[in-house]
Each structure stands twice: as C-alpha cells, then as structure tokens.
Amino acid sequence: MASKKREVQLQSVVNSQNLWDEMLLNKGLTVIDVYQAWCGPCKAVQSLFRKLKNELNEDEILHFVVAEADNIVTLQPFRDKCEPVFLFSLNGKIIAKIQGANAPLINRKVITLIDEERKIVAGEMDRPQYVEIPLVDAIDEEYGEVQYESAAEVYNMAIIKPDAVLMRKNIEVREKIAKEGFVIEIQENLILPEEVVREFYTHIADQPDFEEFVVSMTNGLSCVLIVSQEDSEVIQEETLPQTDTEEEPGVLEEPHVRFAPVMIKKKRDSLQEYMDRQHMSDYCDVEDDAVKVSKLIDILFPDFKTMKSTNVQTTLALLHPDICEEEKDDVLNVIHNEGFTILMQRQIVLSEEEARTVCKIHENEEYFDNLIGHMTSNHSYVLALRRENGVEYWKTLIGPKTIEEAYASHPQSLCVQFASGNFPTNQFYGSSSKAAAEKEIAHFFPPQSTLALIKPHVTHKERMEILKTIKEAGFELTLMKEMHLTPEHANKIYFKITGKDFYKNVLEVLSLGMSLVMVLTKWNAVAEWRRMVGPVDPEEAKLLSPESLRAKYGLDILRNAVHGASNFSEASEIISNVFTEGNPEN
C-alpha cells in the first residue's frame, strides 16, 4: 500500500479532456506518461521520476502526470498502442516525445529541460523557440512521417556452431567482442529450431550439402549472441609524421621529421569485420540485416523486446542480521507486493571483507567497527531480485543510509518501516548499479556445474519438454553431447556403481539408443538438479515428488528418464572425463 501512495503523490492522474486542458496550464516542464486503460501506467520509470523529483527539487517547474489515452480526445493517436509513450509539455506546448521506457534518454531530456528553465528564470539565457510536435495518427507513423526519439536499437545476431561450443570457443568469442566494445545483450546456448537455421542460412540454401548442415545444426548445441554496438566510431592512437623546423625566408633546409602519437577518430569495425579480422568466421556466423534479426529474436527470445522496453533488471538485496532474524518474512511479503521476482536467496554469515563492502558508506562513523562485528557474527539474508528498473527501484524502496535521513526524506521507505535500535543505519543494502549488481550476484551466488543425462527411452517430444523445464528452472545449458553410451562411456558416468550386481542391467538400458549428456550451470546446480530429478524409483517419485522429472517421464527404476551427479566432486570428475575426450583445449 505504501508504494501506491507514493505513486499517487508523484504523478497526477489525468483521465478526461478537461483535466488534460487544465494540465497544459502547468508552469514549467510536465512529463506525461500516456497509457492505455487495459495495461495501466509504465511502472518501469516511476523510481526514475521519484529520483528526479527528489534530486532536482523543483516542484514549481517539474510535474509528472499519467494520462489515460482512452478518455482524452487529444491523445486519440495513441489509443490501442502497447508500447509506452512519454510526452514533454513545456509551458503548455508538447515539444518532445519518447517512445519506449528508455530511462537514460528520459533522464537526459528532463535534466536538460530543467537546466534550461533554471537559466531562463535566472536571466542567463533567452527562452528557445520550441516547435510544438504534432500528435499524428497511426497511419502517419507507419509511413515514417513523424520524427521522435526512440528507444529502438539495431542488433546483430551471431551463431557459434555446435562443434565450436564443445571446444568452448563461445567463451573466447564472448570475451573478445566484449573487449572490443560490443554489447552482448543476450548469450544463450540452445538447440536451434529448424526454421531458425533455414532462415539464418538462406544465403547457402542452394549448396548441395545444405540439408546435412541443417541436421547437424539442429541436433547440436549452438551459442546464440544478440549484440549491439554503443558507438559507431572509436578513438585510436596513431603515429603520424611531424616536422620540427620552422620555415625561414630564403633558407631551404631539409626538415627534421619526427613521428608523434596523435588521437584520431575512426569508424569502428562491424561485428562481421571484427570476426573476419580475428579469424573467428569459420565457426561463428553473423547476421546484420535488421529485419531478419528482429524476426529471429521474436522466435528465439520472444520476451527480449518487452524486457528491453521495460528495462527489466536484476539487483542484489541484503537484509542485515536484525531483519534476517526477526522480520524476514514480513520483508519478503513487501518484496513480493512490490513486483519483484526472487531468483535466488540464501542465508549467510558475511566475511569481514564482505561486511566492509556492504557497510562502506559508514566507514567514517564511530560505530563502524561495532557494525562490522555485528555483521560478521550473525546471519544476513541475500537475494537476487528482478523487476522493471530493479536496481533503482530497490534503492528507492529501502531509502537513505541512515534512519534519521530516511525519516526526513523517505518516511515510507523500508529503512523507516523496519528501523532497528541497535544501529542508526539502514538495515538493507542494494547494488549501486547494473554492473555492480552483476559482480555482487556472481559473488554471493557463484555458478556451479553439474552432470545431467536424459536416457534413451525418453521420446523426442519428452526430451524437448525436459529441456524446456531445465531452461525455465534457470539452468544454463553449458555443454551437450548426444551419445550412444557404450560400456566404456557409461563407466565414466556411472563409475561409482560399476561393481554392483545390477550394473549390467543399467548398461543394457543405456545401449538401447542415444542418450543426451549435458552440463548444466547455475548457483547450487547439483542440489537443484537432484531436486528436479526426484527419487530413483518413478513410483516413489509420484508419491513423494509428483512434479519431478522421474515422476513425469520415468517408466521403472532402470528406465527412470534422467540421471544426475550426487555431489560436486562427482560432477566435476564426470564432466572432465566425458567432455574433454578428444578436446585437449578443454
């Protein structure tokens, strides 16, 4: 409820033509979130607006409004549109429009316009003559007759072929292109659908071995990268000749030439050019046609464009010991009600180094050493949280660094709601940025790999269902081999039971067809996979764990559909034995 109250105070509601006309009388800048009644205002930017309102502190000249397009005649062109639209009204004139929840672009626009208003009020500049933009209808927009600032980006798609993925070449490609300045929006290992392979490789469809190529691409694990480029130009240092001598009238001398480094601006290589230069084109193919890439993204990653437009982010959250011990469940309810998805969570006692990092903003306070002692001797609770604009939203939700500051400026923050008497500090922590969140999540939830196997009796349809379940559970499919498990191969996977009397029956079942051997990666992967797999006997699994894979796909205790390593040590040994065979680089 606290969240809803903050939103009402932050943004005025305009849901009629009369209220729209009144809103245009606002002095200064009004930022208008145009929304449809069926989907509501854009929540992704509300924490940004809250931050701008607090930091700019310009209540007289900065206003935020939500306007329902369905009931306002002026906004008729925006009806039945699902993408967020933000209008900027300056003293009653609509001067700019931003399509999509592009927080950085909105942030820059607001700050620029408010800075101008301040200078105008102070007499430091004349008021610019802005042209009011037309609110055209959908037909005009379709034919490109309107100019507006858009959140759209152009992407390249790269596919690293299955043999190269087995050789871990995808890791090399990712590191190199990121170092070169390309932005990896998505990296995912997956089995490509046939329609994607045919669409991506239309340029070689007339080759005689194309059908064999399609089969190889749809049976192996490829790595797909969606890549964008921040800047089309790059500044490089080059050594150019320069002369030291000055010309004197009537004197002809051979000038002394020296070479000096000069910074020059050059056009950055395209992704394809960079791949060619790095000799990676043999195993990594690139598509740069924007229309085709957009179509392929819709097939492979249907949620990607929505997540980009709504700025879905993952952040690290930490609950201090007093909260963890006494009020964790209440906080988890708030987290759920605020629209966060909890991806991972764990209880942990922080090391001194971790505690000093989390409490760094208090390091100059007298109570700092006592605070560190408290943090390192009691359990804290860490979570990976995801939602629209997650990093900023969590920071705003928890409030400032001290209880005193929170009471003054954020009385509805978690800092105030769950204030503790032991220390004057905020009992919550959040990542400072997206980059910091990635590092902190990797630290507190380090990825782990486990060995997984789908047995021969599982049908192709069931196999694809299992792979879908694996993806939905948050596992990364790191490596995969389809293998006929001979006794030699099976011994590498089942080495712990090779001496058992029933092992010959295991070998018989495995010899009936092709098995799918996989490396699955996520935090706590071994335990998570064993939980998903369920009890060894499918009949027991149906009673104790009816949603487990063995309960759904197992036939009997030998044909129980799937297998997994018992512990991390066993998983590491099997992975080393199975996936480095013939691959000395691994």
From Swiss-Prot:
Location in or out of the cell: Cytoplasm
Gene3D superfamilies named in the record: Glutaredoxin, Nucleoside diphosphate kinase-like domain
Key words, A-Z: Cytoplasm, Developmental protein, Differentiation, Disulfide bond, Hydrolase, Repeat, Spermatogenesis
Segments for region (NDK 3): 453-586
Knockout or disruption consequences: Deficient mice display normal reproductive system phenotype.
Record GO terms (molecular function): 3'-5' exonuclease activity; microtubule binding
Signal peptide location: none
E.C. no: 3.1.-.-
Function comment: Probably required during the final stages of sperm tail maturation in the testis and/or epididymis, where extensive disulfide bonding of fibrous sheath (FS) proteins occurs. In vitro, it has neither nucleoside diphosphate kinase (NDPK) activity nor reducing activity on disulfide bonds. Exhibits a 3'-5' exonuclease activity with a preference for single-stranded DNA, suggesting roles in DNA proofreading and repair.
Stated name of the protein: Thioredoxin domain-containing protein 3
Record gene name: Nme8
